[in-house]
A protein has these predicted regions:
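Oxyanion-binding/catalytic loops of NTP- or PPi-dependent enzymes
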Residues: 1-76, 97, 115-515
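Short, conserved non-catalytic motifs in the polymerase core
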Residues: 84-96, 271-272
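Amphipathic alpha-helical coiled-coil/leucine-zipper-like oligomerization segments
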Residues: 99-111
Length: 515
C-alpha cells in the first residue's frame, strides 16, 4: 500500500484515496457510511464533532451548530460562531468559534480515520486558490496530524489520474479538464503525451459551483410557494435545511425532466413542481460565467477550440445536462464520460502520492503508475508594489510590478531589481501581491504581505534592491528583498502559521471527539 495518501478536500464532499497492491487508485470509504465520498458538513457540539451526512441530522434541532461550505472561507480572517450560526470577523469572535482551518481539520481527521496508515498526504486545492487559502489548508492538515508532502491543483490531479489509466493512449494530446464541483470551478488545459502531464494554463472561479445552483433552485421554490400560499419560506431559520432540499431536486433534474416535492412552510405543506427547463433558466447567469471562463482558458493558451483533442469532466456538478451541452457548443464535440467524476480528483492525488513515494512501492504498483510525470504552472501574477515617477501626473505613484508571470512553470524563481527614489531613503516597502490579471493599479491586486527593509546607512537615490521570488510546486511563495550595497535582507516565507499559533488553535479542539 502507498505510504502517502491522496485527499480531495472539497466544498461539498471530500474523499481519501491510496494505491492498492496492484497500483490502482482506491477511494476509501468509512465503515459507517455506504459511500466513498464524505459530506464536508460538520456538526460541532461541546465535546463532539460529527462529520458527514450524519451532521445534517442536527439541522432541525441545532442549525447554528452545523457548518458547511468551509472551503470558501479558507482565505478569510474569519471564525464560525456557533452562537450566531455564521462566519464572523476574527476580532469579533469569542467562545465557541472555529477558524476555517480548524473546521477543515475536523474533516481531515475524519478522512484520516478511514485508514490506520495515514501520516503523509498529497492534498488537492482549486487551481485558483489564493495564497492564504493554501496556507490555511496546510494548517488544517497539521492540526489533523497529517504531513502535507505537496498541495496539487484539483484539475491537475484529475489529469494525473487520466494519464495513469491503461487506455491513456486514447486521450493523449491537448486535454481540457473541466472541473465543476460544489463550491469552485476550474478549467485547465494541458498536454498529455506518454503519461506526461504538462499544464498550459488554468482559469476558474472559487465562488462558482453546485451550491450556487442550489440557491437558485431555493429561490424558485420560494417564489412558487409564495405564489401558491401568499407567504415566503422562512429562510432565516432553516436555510441549510432548504438548501439540502434544493440539492435533492437538482440531482433529480439531472436525470428527469421535472420533479415534484412537498415543501413545508409557514402556510403549511405545499406540493411544488420544478421542471428542468425552469432550473436551466434560473442558472443561466452561472452557465454564461462558466462559458466565459472556458473561452478565456482556451484564448489564454494561444490555441483554438478545434485544436483541443478531448474535454474531461470532473466534479459532481458536471452531471447536470446543460453543462455538457454548453461544453459541446464551445468545443464542437461532446466531453468524454465514463469515469467517476466524484472520485477522479482523489484518485489523481493518490497516483501523485505514489509518484512521491516510489521507493516504497511494490513492483506491481510501480508498473501501474508507469511513467506518469507532472508539470504545473503558477496560476497567478505574483508581484510587488513599487513607487515610481509619473511624468504625466508630475508626481510619484505606487503601482504593482509583476515578478513572476502567470503560467510560469513550477517550481519558479525570478529576480528583478527596484530602486529608491529619494536621497537618504531609510527603508523600502517589501510587499507581495497576487492577481489573476496583469494589473499595475494596486487597487486591483490582492496584497498578501507587507513589510519594510530598513537600510543600515544613508545613500543617494537609486539604491538597488534585488527582489527574488521563489514559487514552489504547492503554490506557496518565498521572497527575498536584498539591499545590494549592504547585503541586508528582508525574507518572507509564507508558510503555515507558527507552531505556537497552531498549538493555540489545536488546544481549543484537541479534547473534541470526531465521529
Amino acid at each position: 500500500m502507498s505510504k502517502i495518501i491522496g485527499i480531495d478536500l472539497g466544498t461539498t464532499y471530500s474523499a481519501i484515496a491510496q494505491l492498492d497492491d496492484l497500483g490502482n487508485p482506491e477511494v476509501l470509504s468509512s465503515t459507517d457510511e455506504n459511500r466513498k465520498i464524505t459530506a464536508s458538513t460538520i456538526y460541532v457540539g461541546v465535546e463532539k464533532v460529527i462529520v458527514g451526512d450524519k451532521a445534517l441530522d442536527a439541522l432541525a434541532a441545532t442549525p447554528k451548530n452545523v457548518i458547511s461550505e468551509t472551503k470558501r472561507q479558507m482565505e478569510n480572517d474569519v471564525k464560525y460562531s456557533t452562537e450566531k450560526g455564521e462566519w464572523v470577523e476574527k476580532d469579533e469572535a469569542e467562545e465557541n468559534c472555529y477558524t476555517p482551518a480548524q473546521v477543515s481539520s475536523f474533516i481531515l481527521s475524519k478522512l484520516k480515520g478511514y485508514t490506520s496508515e495515514v501520516q503523509k498526504a498529497v492534498i488537492t486545492v482549486p487551481a485558483l486558490f489564493a495564497e492564504k487559502a493554501r496556507i490555511a489548508t496546510l494548517d488544517a492538515a497539521k492540526m489533523a496530524g497529517i504531513e502535507v508532502i505537496e498541495l496539487i491543483n484539483e484539475p491537475t490531479a484529475a489529469a494525473c489520474y487520466y494519464a495513469s489509466l491503461p487506455n491513456v493512449e486514447k486521450i493523449t494530446g491537448k486535454i481540457l479538464v473541466f472541473d465543476l464541483g460544489g463550491g469552485t470551478f476550474d478549467v485547465t488545459l494541458c498536454n498529455v503525451i506518454d503519461q506526461k502531464v504538462d499544464v498550459i494554463t488554468s482559469r476558474g472561479d472559487k465562488w462558482l459551483g453546485g451550491k450556487d445552483f442550489d440557491k437558485e433552485i431555493l429561490d424558485l421554490i420560494d417564489k412558487k410557494y409564495k405564489k401558491e400560499t401568499g407567504k415566503n419560506l422562512d429562510l432565516s431559520q432553516g436555510k441549510l435545511q432548504y438548501l439540502e432540499f434544493a440539492e435533492k431536486i437538482k440531482r433529480s433534474l439531472s436525470v428527469k425532466s421535472k420533479h415534484a416535492e412537498v415543501v413545508e412552510g409557514p402556510a403549511g405543506p405545499k406540493k411544488i413542481e420544478i421542471t428542468r427547463s425552469e432550473f436551466e433558466q434560473s442558472i443561466q447567469m452561472h452557465i454564461e460565467k462558466l462559458k466565459m471562463l472556458l473561452e478565456e482558458c482556451i484564448d489564454g493558451s494561444g490555441h483554438e477550440a478545434k485544436e483541443i483533442n478531448h474535454t474531461l469532466l470532473v466534479g459532481g456538478s458536471t452531471r447536470i445536462p446543460i453543462i455538457s451541452k454548453t461544453i459541446e457548443k464551445v468545443m464542437g464535440k461532446p466531453p468524454l464520460k465514463g469515469v467517476n467524476v466524484d472520485e477522479a480528483v482523489a484518485a489523481g492525488a493518490a497516483v501523485y502520492a505514489g509518484l512521491k513515494s516510489k521507493t516504497s512501492l511494490n513492483t506491481a504498483q510501480k508498473k501501474a503508475i508507469g511513467k506518469v510525470q507532472l508539470k504545473d504552472v503558477c496560476n497567478f501574477y505574483m508581484g510587488t508594489l513599487v513607487q515610481r515617477d509619473d511624468p504625466v501626473l508630475n508626481r510619484k505613484i505606487i503601482e504593482n510590478m509583476v515578478v513572476i508571470e502567470r503560467d510560469t512553470k513550477l517550481p519558479a524563481e525570478e529576480t528583478t531589481s527596484v530602486y529608491t527614489l529619494y536621497d537618504d531613503q531609510h527603508a523600502i516597502d517589501c510587499s507581495i501581491t497576487q492577481s489573476e490579471g496583469r494589473e499595475s493599479n494596486r487597487e486591483f491586486v490582492n496584497l498578501i504581505h507587507q513589510g519594510d527593509l530598513e537600510f543600515p546607512d544613508k545613500k543617494p537615490k537609486g539604491r538597488e534592491i534585488q527582489v527574488t521570488y521563489k514559487y514552489d510546486t504547492s503554490g506557496v511563495i518565498h521572497c527575498t528583498f536584498k539591499d545590494v550595497s549592504s547585503n541586508k535582507k528582508y525574507e518572507i516565507s509564507l508558510r503555515p502559521e507558527s507552531a505556537e499559533d497552531l498549538k493555540k488553535q489545536y488546544e481549543t479542539i484537541e479534547h473534541i471527539v470526531i465521529e
